[in-house]
A protein has these predicted regions:
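NTP-handling and nucleic-acid-processing catalytic cores
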Residues: 1-101, 172-206, 210, 227, ...
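Short amphipathic alpha-helical coiled-coil/interface segments
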Residues: 197, 397, 440, 444, ...
Length: 705
């Protein structure tokens, strides 16, 4: 609503827009922007406040936005935090017109005294209209704070509170980060930290709640009436750790040795919850006593937390640690993204959208919860999470159990000892054996490097890929029919034990249990005390022939295996059928290496024969090109050539139709002139894909002719 405020100059008035008409009796000024030339002439003048007859000044302050409303705002220092600051700058009177329970008091005027604030709003607007002060009412979208428990509108009001002076505490905490003694990871968060700390305000630490740490301030009793209690701030007080110490200080302060505990009354307010939280790095270790834990664990190395509490918690722990312990509480502050709900909203009590970790643990397991969160939480951005996301961790736990069971079965069937690490004989190793060891070496190096850089998500993904893909998908399958089972089992035990240790920070329960069941650990031992894997020594790598060349060769061989399996699927060859294949290598030396892999390839291909040739001549069968050459699948006796020829012809016709459709668009001048460049480039890229597909389809058409 807009309120016309009659001025003192004849019948002049100024127009004020407000969303809080009920606070009008508490107004002590109206304000304009200093650069707003429309109102330069009235700055410093007085106006009469409607319905009260009280004169209030017109002031200028940068807080006022010229373009907002009428460009003039009413200032109520006792009932708005921004108005309070304006009032401080201009030394305005603070008139509190409400009681603690949201009713108007006597300062609001006799007519409104006792009314509920919302009832008063309606009454004031009606009276303004009746007196001719109301110009008009219009709808306005406003951000109104509500209590998350009772959903009542929160009312800002003036009250006496306890504050901590923060600037002297902030200065050494700023210096600790600027000097490099403490660093943020990623570093960009240090700018946010500096911005808050360099513009820090005194901290209001008192809260009017029933629960919490009670403020250790004690008043010397005087008038015990309600009116006397309301004047607590005028009574002498002391601050002390205990009531007994408070009594000693009260006696010293007043000079009255006859004071007793009955003469002291502790302040009823409690401390802001962050006031106890900022002591966390040392209060949990026995402080203020000088304990062994405090001496050993303070300061710690790393703090890992989310960006939304850098100021509320991180900065305050820095200040408290330096003030009380004379050194920062941690060396590295690792900031990760916020874990949000499935809709991207921050989890909060008011929204009721927080996930219950106990429910997740009950349904998926504690390890699944830990690993899944590590896998989706990054340093770079926020992440969305719902219950289904924890299936990843649960499925991974199952994979670990199944792999462990396979090892137990193999040990029992072949008489292998899981408890003792068998020596690895370099002369007995195949290329797949060496590849597994190199993959383990690379995984250990990668995980150590990523954890050293606090890339916890990337390290989790690296361990996941190493265990699931390299160990389970490939090497376990190889080990089932390995030509040298003893060598394969020795390697499998070695890499499995390393994988469990790499996984332990993420999944401590399943890795600990499996390590004991497999005999890697004795009774009373724990992975926590085991060495974190670093890879292999130079001597071991030399003795076992572990090179990047071996690794790359087996990776290319696996690419060929995947291609052959894709061909089988494409032509719907029965998984049980044995096929005939040909590998055409790029060079003769590659062909020689591949001949040594024939038995392994026959098992992987499920082939009755694998012919190795070299050269460039195209063979009359479907094939897929890879790094080592082209793998071909003979379809003789496996597919209905007539049916396949018909299928290929239909697909060829459909693909050619798609190309014609794209050509029609690209030849349309209107489309080219108005379509976004990205759309046009996308159409061209799609056309190139279809052209390549046609080449393959034409080859197949010849094959089935």
């Amino acid at each position: 609503s807009a309120l016309g405020v009659k001025g003192v100059l004849n019948t002049d008035y100024i127009m004020v827009a407000t969303t809080r008409p009920e606070t009008l009796p508490g107004d002590t000024a109206v304000a304009v922007n200093p650069s707003d030339e429309r109102f330069t002439a009235i700055v410093g003048k007085n106006v009469i406040l409607p319905l009260t007859g009280r004169e209030i000044p017109v002031i200028s302050d940068m807080y006022v936005e010229k373009e907002f409303g009428t460009g003039i705002v009413k200032i109520t220092p006792a009932h708005d935090p921004n108005d309070f600051l304006v009032g401080k700058r201009h030394n305005l009177e603070q008139i509190n017109i409400m009681t603690d329970d949201g009713h108007m008091n006597e300062l609001a005027g006799a007519k409104y005294c006792g009314m509920d604030r919302f009832e008063c709003r309606k009454a004031l607007v009606a009276d303004l209209e009746a007196e001719g002060y109301l110009d008009h009412i219009e709808d306005y979208d406003n951000q109104v704070g509500h209590c998350y428990r009772c959903h009542e509108v929160v009312e800002s009001r003036l009250s006496k509170q306890w504050f901590v002076r923060m600037k002297p505490l902030a200065e050494p905490a700023i210096a600790a980060v600027k000097s490099g003694e403490v660093r943020f990871v990623p570093d960009r968060w240090s700018k946010i930290y500096f911005n808050w700390m360099e513009n820090i305000q005194d901290w209001c630490i008192s809260r009017q709640l029933w629960w919490g740490h009670r403020i250790p301030a004690y008043y010397v009793r005087g008038d015990s009436s309600e009116e006397g209690k309301a004047k607590n701030e005028e009574r002498p007080f002391v601050v002390a750790e205990t009531p007994e110490k408070a009594l000693e200080r009260a006696k010293a302060m007043t000079g009255n040795d006859k004071l007793t505990m009955a003469d002291l009354e502790q302040d009823e307010d409690v401390l802001d919850t962050w006031f106890s939280s900022w002591l966390w790095p040392f209060s949990t270790l026995g402080w203020p006593e000088k304990t062994a834990d405090l001496d050993y664990y303070y300061p710690t190395t790393d703090l890992v937390t989310a960006q939304d509490i850098i100021f509320f918690w991180v900065a305050r722990m820095m200040m408290a640690g330096i003030h009380f312990m004379k050194k920062p509480p941690f060396a590295n502050i690792v900031i990760h993204g916020i874990v949000r709900d499935a809709q991207g909203r921050k989890m909060s009590k008011s929204l009721g959208n927080s996930l219950d970790p106990l429910k997740i643990i009950d349904e998926y397991s504690a390890d699944a919860l830990r690993f899944s969160l590590a896998l989706i939480t990054s340093l770079d951005c926020d992440s969305k999470v719902d219950m289904k996301k924890f299936e990843v961790g649960r499925n991974f736990s199952t994979k670990i159990w199944n792999a462990a069971r396979f090892m137990q079965m193999q040990a029992e069937a072949n008489g292998f000892d899981l408890a003792a690490a068998a020596p690895i004989d370099g002369a007995a190793l195949s290329s797949d054996d060496r590849h597994m060891l190199v993959a383990c070496e690379k995984a250990c190096e990668k995980v150590n490097d990523l954890l050293g850089k606090y890339r916890i998500q990337d390290a989790a993904l690296a361990v996941y890929d190493f265990f699931w893909t390299q160990i389970c998908d490939w090497y376990v399958e190889y080990a089932k029919d390995a030509p040298n089972k003893a060598a394969a089992f020795a390697i499998l035990r070695d890499v499995f034990w390393k994988a469990l240790r790499l996984l332990h920070p993420y999944m401590p329960f399943v890795t600990e249990e499996v390590a004991h069941q497999l005999g890697f650990l004795k009774e009373g031992e724990t992975i926590l005390r085991a060495e974190f894997p670093k890879g292999y020594t130079a001597e071991e790598k030399a003795a076992w022939g572990l090179t990047d060349e071996v690794y790359d060769f087996v990776e290319a061989k696996r690419e060929m295996i995947t291609s052959l399996r894709a061909l089988r699927a494409e032509y719907k060859v029965s998984p049980a059928a044995f096929v005939k294949t040909t590998i055409q290598c790029h060079a003769a030396e590659v062909a020689e290496k591949m001949k040594a892999e024939v038995e392994t390839l026959k098992k992987a291909f499920r082939a009755e024969s694998v012919d190795i040739v070299s050269g460039e001549a195209e063979l009359a069968m479907p094939g897929i090109l890879g790094k080592l050459g082209t793998v071909y699948l003979s379809l003789e006796g496996l597919v209905d050539k007539a049916a396949e020829a018909k299928r290929v012809a239909t697909e060829l016709q459909k693909t050619q139709g798609f190309i014609k459709s794209i050509d029609a668009k690209l030849s349309n001048e209107n489309f080219v002139a108005h379509a976004p460049a990205a759309i046009i480039e996308g159409q061209k890229a799609k056309r190139a894909e279809l052209e390549a597909k046609i080449v393959q389809l034409e080859k197949l058409a010849k094959l089935f002719a």
